[in-house]
Amino acid sequence: MDPEELIDNFELLGSWEERYQYLIELGKELPPLSEEECNEANRVRGCMSQVWLVADDDPEKLIFRGDSDAHIVRGLIALLRMLMSGRSPSEVQAMDIGDIFSRLGLENQITANRRNGFYAMVERIRALAAERAAG
């Protein structure tokens, strides 16, 4: 999804309660990872919740999937998938996720721990993209 489209979608939602509900709904639509994929190697460090991210073996575009034990975090994973999955590794590396995060208004609306976890997920996704690009 184009970042501007996602920002527009968020702006259509009036209150933060509606935006949180939207994130939760996005998370509910996220396909779960298998038990085998929810392992230490795929775990994202720096998140208060349990978070796992995996990527398909495709050097030309990053297709990643993720899961968490927290509803809002699952929504944030879904949001990152919408923005970053399906792009080339170089596009993933170049995306200014911090700017998008701020423009979505999330910077001031989620806890510092959750924000740190969000950026830990972004770094893990970028690492997965770099691994795919390196072959």
Which ranges hold each PLM region?
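Active-site- and interface-proximal helix/loop "cap" or "latch" segments in soluble metabolic
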Residues: 73-108, 115
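Short acidic alpha-helix initiation/capping motifs at coil-to-helix transition points
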Residues: 1-2, 71-75
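N-terminal intrinsically disordered, cationic/polar leader segments
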Residues: 1-50, 57-61, 101-135
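Conserved interaction-surface patches within small, structured recognition/assembly domains
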Residues: 56-70, 81-85
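Short, glycine/acidic-enriched capping/hinge loops at junctions between secondary-structure elements
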Residues: 34-38, 65-66, 76-77
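Secondary-structure capping and boundary motifs in well-ordered enzyme cores
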Residues: 45-46, 68-72
